[in-house]
């Protein structure tokens, strides 16, 4: 009797172990099949040393992962050659969609032709690509409008000015902002650009560059910066030079959360606010529409000017 029970329990244990093994295999097989059906998306920004691009990447990732897919992001750190190699690497990895934010507006034709040959959908974000024929869609802010908004505020709040420009000419979005500003002040001879310099839109570069311009042109009383990080660098230089908030009008583009405090304190005059959250989300949604066979559509989002008069409106403490 004891032997019979022992055999019976042994048989039941064997069946139980076999069932567990089958269940584990089924789960593993399901996981493998899920991984095989997940689509890869790639994103290559000009830099991630800017919270603006971190927010865009965060929004794209949220949409992609909600679809059960994968986003691979790369940071070429403002190096055009490295960006091209990062793009080639993502093409080799088999991405279906590539979001690009070019370091420069040129030199992309060869690698974008490679993306097209590999049937990769390319979507430009935050800035236009010179080789637009290789791009399925572009999602940007109205960059010329952003510069023009800053100029319009300046013209209505000052009788004249000696202006310094902080630029990033290789980035088309930045160049368009400065061009929008220049065009708007061109009809007002009391406003003159007396100094301009490149800063790649980086705070740590803008600060010493601004200090040099102030030393060479102490008459500067207006600063137009391509973005808010550059404006923050300019403000740091102005403070180091002993300027007070009322001495210099400072304009930027982006709407970084810190800009609100600087506007309240009088150090920053205004910023043309972009919405990196909408840019990222809409770029990702556009990618899925194209994958579904729908017609591609370029998107240009309006900017709005943030000043001391409206700085406390809709202040959620973060990005738009």
Task: Annotate each PLM feature.
Residues 73, 130-153, 165-168, 196, ...:
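Short beta-strand elements at the ligand-binding edges of bilobed clamshell
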Residues 97-116, 181, 192-195, 200-260:
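Hydrophobic alpha-helical
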Residues 105-145, 156, 162, 256-264, ...:
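Flexible loop/hinge segments that line or gate small-molecule binding clefts
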């Amino acid at each position: 009797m004891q032997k019979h029970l022992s055999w019976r329990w042994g048989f039941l244990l064997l069946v139980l172990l076999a069932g567990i093994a089958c269940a584990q295999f089924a789960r593993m097989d399901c996981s493998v099949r899920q991984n095989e059906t997940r689509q890869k998306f790639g994103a290559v920004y000009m830099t991630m040393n800017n919270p603006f691009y971190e927010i865009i990447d965060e929004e794209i990732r949220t949409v992609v992962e909600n679809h059960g897919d994968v986003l691979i992001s790369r940071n070429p750190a403002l190096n055009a050659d490295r960006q091209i190699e990062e793009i080639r690497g993502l093409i080799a990895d088999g991405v279906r969609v590539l979001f690009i934010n070019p370091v420069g507006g040129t030199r992309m034709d060869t690698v974008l032709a490679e993306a097209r040959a590999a049937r990769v959908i390319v979507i430009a974000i935050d800035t236009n690509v010179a080789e637009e024929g290789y791009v399925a869609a572009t999602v940007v802010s109205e960059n010329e409008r952003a510069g023009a908004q800053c100029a319009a505020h300046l013209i209505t709040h000052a009788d004249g000015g000696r202006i310094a420009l902080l630029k990033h000419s290789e980035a088309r979005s930045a160049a368009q902002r400065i061009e929008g500003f220049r065009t708007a002040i061109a009809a007002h001879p009391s406003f003159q650009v007396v100094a301009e310099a490149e800063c790649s839109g980086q705070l740590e570069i803008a600060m010493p560059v601004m200090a040099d311009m102030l030393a060479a042109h102490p008459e500067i009383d207006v600063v137009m910066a391509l973005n808010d990080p550059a404006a923050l660098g300019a403000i740091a230089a102005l403070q180091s030079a002993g300027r007070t908030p009322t001495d210099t009008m400072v304009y930027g583009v982006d709407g970084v959360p810190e800009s609100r405090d600087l506007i309240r304190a009088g150090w920053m005059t205004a910023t043309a606010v972009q919405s990196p959250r909408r840019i990222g989300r809409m770029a990702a949604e556009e990618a899925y529409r194209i994958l579904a066979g729908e017609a591609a559509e370029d998107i240009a989002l309006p900017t709005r000017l943030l000043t001391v008069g409206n700085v406390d409106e809709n202040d959620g403490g973060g990005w738009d």
